């Protein structure tokens, strides 16, 4: 899947002012994604989290800035990078956001499918 979409998908990534910026960007690049837009307004660690009320990637409000980047997929991690939020652009240009359970199900599906090959 990454080989097919790595050069096509545009991904915005935000660590929400936390510690995961460099590692998250590097992980996406090493996985094979080539169109990564880091959300510069939220990239640098900053404890007061000036651009969000709560730096929780499960709250759709944290994607307000990254939506302006116009990416196909939005990824956000919380400040200590142990939770992830995902949004994707729909045909009408709006974004849908996945729940934690949906993200986990997709990851398990990907892992099991990859093991069969």
Language model: regions and residue ranges:
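Phosphate-binding chemistry for phosphorylated carbohydrates and sugar-nucleotides
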Residues: 1-117
């Amino acid at each position: 899947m990454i080989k097919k979409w790595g050069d096509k998908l545009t991904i915005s990534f935000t660590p929400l002012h936390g510690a995961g910026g460099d590692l998250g960007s590097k992980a996406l690049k090493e996985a094979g994604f080539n169109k990564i837009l880091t959300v510069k307004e939220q990239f640098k660690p900053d404890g007061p989290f000036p651009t969000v009320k709560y730096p929780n990637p499960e709250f759709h409000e944290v994607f307000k800035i990254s939506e302006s980047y116009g990416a196909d997929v939005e990824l956000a991690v919380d400040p200590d990078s142990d939770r992830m939020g995902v949004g994707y652009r729909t045909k009408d240009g709006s974004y849908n956001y996945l729940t934690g359970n949906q993200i986990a199900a997709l990851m398990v599906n990907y892992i099991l499918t990859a093991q069969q090959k």
